[in-house]
Amino acid sequence: MSMPDIAFDRYYTYDEMTERLKALASAHPELATLTSIGTSFQGRDVWLMEIGNPKTGPALEKPGYYIDAQIHAEEHATSATALYAIWHLLTNYGRDEEVTRLVDSQVFYILPRINPDGAELSLQPPYFNWCGNGRFQPGFDRLEGLIPEDIDGDGFLVWMRVPDSRGEWKKSESNPDIMVQRRPGEEGGQYYRLYPEGSIRNFDGVNVPIEQPFDGNMNRNFPTNWSPQEYGAGTHPLSEPEAAAMAKLILDHPNICGMCAYHTHGGIIMRPSMTKPDSAMSAADINLYKEIGKVGTELTGYPTVSIYEDFTPDKTKVRRGGLMDWTYEEMGIISFGTELWDLERTAGVPKEGYYNLYPRNEAVQQKVYDYVKANMAEKGWRDWKPFDHPQLGPVEIGGMVNIWTYRNPPGFLLEEICRTNVLFNLKHAAAAPRVKVDSLTVEPLGAGLYKVRAEISNHGYLPTNLSSVAIANNVAKPVLASISIDGGELVMNPLHANLGHLAGRNERLYPWSPWGQQWSTTAKPVEWLVRIAGKGTITVTAKSEKGGTHRVEKSIG
């Protein structure tokens, strides 16, 4: 099939994304396989692009790296970044040394759009800012209160400012487009209440309640620390078909040793834990996260932060049922989540905190307003206009279009965001453990007996167990060394030798000290006694679930 234009200055619909994925797989059949891991509520495929070189060995015998995107419908920049990762790996194979090495030695599992139903709703006017996963039309899951609706018919969901003497807001004196908070004890002005645009179900004439949506927030639908009280958590863990398909993919590929889930927004690289402080985590694992995170910060400018410590304003209300806690706390996989794009930093606002729900002063709002008006035009800002609301009476509708400002960058900035974040993920992938048979010697002892000695080592940055929590949970498989003999027999020592775990370079960040982290072994020898009468061949295999499989063959006689 012909290759459509693949540009990284726009956001693609499901059909457009599917067309490009199929074209990339068709253009690179020796490296890429496109499959569907499941279907959404509305019957759309959840696509998986697997990238690797089968000529260099089976995929499950290589370290795997996993990327997913758009688990939340409105996070369109994430899907673009995952598509960029696919495009970058395929089009740079044979041209870029690092890409070629990674594709030859590892395998990539990339899910560019986990939530195709919600994404499709969010991409079309009126650009719903929260769509769940399409189980419900936005608002249909709410029993009463404010329902998102484009009541003025301009094609955008924005804000309603409602005159109210009890209101929390007032218009800025210097820029009436901006709403500033009413100060404690302030009286005597024109005040407003600010609501998302919509109508009110079962309105009592007084209150405008806003219910949390029930529709699936799939990043609260995973087994670890799952709670039904989390908004969008589903009826039980993995109740949502897309989340269940993701979980099956991860469980079916035990070679996955690194992960990144793309989100928007905030311009940060997130690490575990979602539910506990650093003091309750493995210090060695935290050091691992920080060192790999430094590489991400150098490439993207995004700081690496703990979700619990730095991204949870109320420690009594932690996020439960997240993908990252499941993959790290249960399986020990070094997992990151990147919040792409930071409007405020781009607009010149100094970073004060990592979580975005906090009051903005007038100066901050003015900087953001100026940037949005200059760079996003009517798609980012809707001028306030009078409207006679059927329930609230005279209101004004307008303001920031959050989905095309705070949640997603303008097209002219998108490609650089994609590029730098994908480069970080490739560095993370390259940190995988890599088990090799470094040497294989055969010493003749006479009478057809031979002593076979091999040295098995880990050439990677990460240990073969990946993390301390993997050992604590008893899920880290040991490195195995085995021998096969063609034309002879094994005389002494087991056919399969359990070598335990092999450390990576990460332990040795500074010269040895009795007060520092003590070093574990990165290599181990193994010996066998074999008998071969005449000519034969021996093959020694080093196998690690996370660090790959390597074989060395030697002829005897």
What are these regions (language model features)?
Residues 1-47, 416:
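Short glycine- and acidic-rich boundary segments immediately preceding or forming the N-terminal edge
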Residues 43, 61-82, 113, 262-263:
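Short HxH-centered metal-ligating active-site micro-motif
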Residues 22-26, 50, 237, 255:
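Soluble secreted/lumenal catalytic domains
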Residues 150, 154:
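Acidic carboxylate motifs that coordinate Ca2+ or other divalent cations, activating on Asp/Glu
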Residues 33-34, 68, 109-111, 117, ...:
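Metallocarboxypeptidase
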Residues 451-557:
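C-terminal beta-sandwich/jelly-roll accessory domains of carbohydrate-active enzymes
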Residues 78-124:
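Short helix-loop-beta-strand segments that form the rim/entrance of peptidase-like active sites
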Residues 48-58, 70:
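Short beta-strand-to-loop junctions in surface cap/lid or active-site-entrance loops
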